[in-house]
Amino acid sequence: MDPYKNLNPKGYQRQRPFSSAGESGGSGGSGTAHETDDNKKKKKLLHRDIERQRRQEMATLFATLRTHLPLKYIKGKRAVSDHVNGAVNFIKDTEARIKELSARRDELSRETGQGYKSNPDPGKTGSDVGKSEPATVMVQPHVSGLEVVVSSNSSGPEALPLSKVLETIQEKGLEVMSSFTTRVNDRLMHTIQVEVNSFGCIDLLWLQQKLVEDLILSTGY
């Protein structure tokens, strides 16, 4: 007997099932890798959709912002960053304007009160002094829109009731948010808060002039 002869030739084939198992395992791994690739593709598509939606929403917001800005702040500027800077400058200018007009209003209120306390003509009563003052209208920007301040005599044909002021403002297509009236030395001061959707499109001086015409000039006050 040849000692080098393999007595069990099948023994060397016993490893084949092991090799087959390896092949089976490789097939399973390929399936898992395929599923992983599908998940990655789905995530990429989802991320792409979210990013596209975000850009559309931002474009809509910037378009809305441009409609609220006066032309002088964005004229000749196309970049979004320029529009944002224009909005910042507009807000700063508006805040400064509000402070300036508020200080002017307070000054006028103090002057009005002092004018009625001091009687320049001894032959006139305080009521007569009040009647000599014409009605006034002032329109100024406010945080939530506009503020309309109307001052008139508290009695007599020159008096401007709050109902008439509100009616005139609403005829201009403006929405009144709140209103209140104070009395200072026979004078009525109506303060009306008005909501404005597109502040940059309203000319404050034009609106003030129209209110003066409708409330004062048309009635001869």
From Swiss-Prot:
GO BP of this protein: regulation of transcription by RNA polymerase II
Oligomer and partners: Homodimer.
Domain bHLH: 42-94
Protein name according to UniProt: Transcription factor bHLH126
Organism: Arabidopsis thaliana (Mouse-ear cress)
CDD domains in the record: bHLH_AtORG2_like
Region (Disordered): 1-46, 104-132
Source organism superkingdom: Eukaryota
Transcription regulation in keyword set: yes
One GO cellular component, as annotated: nucleus
Organism lineage: Eukaryota, Viridiplantae, Streptophyta, Embryophyta, Tracheophyta
GO molecular function: DNA binding; DNA-binding transcription factor activity; protein dimerization activity
Primary subcellular site in the record, as a coarse category: nucleus
Alphabetical keyword list: DNA-binding, Nucleus, Transcription, Transcription regulation
Gene3D superfamilies: Helix-loop-helix DNA-binding domain
InterPro entries for the chain: bHLH_dom (IPR011598), HLH_DNA-bd_sf (IPR036638), MASH1/Ascl1a-like (IPR015660)
Compartments where located: Nucleus
